[in-house]
A protein has these predicted regions:
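C-terminal ends of transmembrane helices
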Residues: 41-50, 97-105
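Structural signature of hydrophobic alpha-helical transmembrane segments
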Residues: 24-37, 85
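Membrane-helix boundary elements
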Residues: 1-26
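Short juxtamembrane and helix-loop transition motifs at transmembrane-helix boundaries
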Residues: 17-26, 44-55
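Canonical alpha-helical transmembrane segment with a positive-inside/aromatic-interface signature
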Residues: 86-110
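Cytoplasmic-side transmembrane-helix entry/capping segments in multi-pass membrane proteins
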Residues: 1-5, 28-29, 53-63, 86, ...
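Alpha-helical transmembrane segments of multi-pass membrane proteins
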Residues: 15, 31-42, 68-69, 91-98
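Membrane-helix boundary connector in multi-pass membrane proteins
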Residues: 71-85
Length: 110
């Protein structure tokens, strides 16, 4: 319940204040969001399978975001940032859809 309230407050604050993302951070934002979504869907799946551990969830959430950002940063330094960003999005997208399929099977039996 606290998480839902925090989400609503965050959305409202974002709509009211219209924050701008610094140009330096923009390449990493989309990767961070997708990495965070991967952790959230993994957490939902674990919750439905009754193996959810909040410590594992928080560590997974932070670690996914940091590793994805680090990979993009290294790619930018090597001049292949766009290709690595695409690779990260594809890999995390596959994981998200895998978790979504498991959630669908668990919730709807299909």
């Amino acid at each position: 319940m606290i998480g839902i309230a925090a989400l609503v407050v965050g959305i409202v604050l974002g709509l009211v204040f219209h924050p701008s993302v610094p140009e330096v951070i923009q390449p990493y934002l989309s990767i961070a969001v997708v990495a965070a979504l991967d952790a959230v869907f993994g957490g939902l799946r674990a919750y439905l399978e009754r193996i959810f551990d909040s410590k594992v969830f928080v560590i997974s959430f932070v670690f996914n975001v940091l590793v994805a950002a680090l990979i993009v940063y290294v790619g930018d330094q090597l001049g292949v940032g766009t290709q690595l960003s695409t690779a990260i999005i594809v890999v995390l997208g596959i994981r998200i859809f895998g978790n979504a399929a498991a959630l669908r099977r668990r919730l709807f039996g299909a």
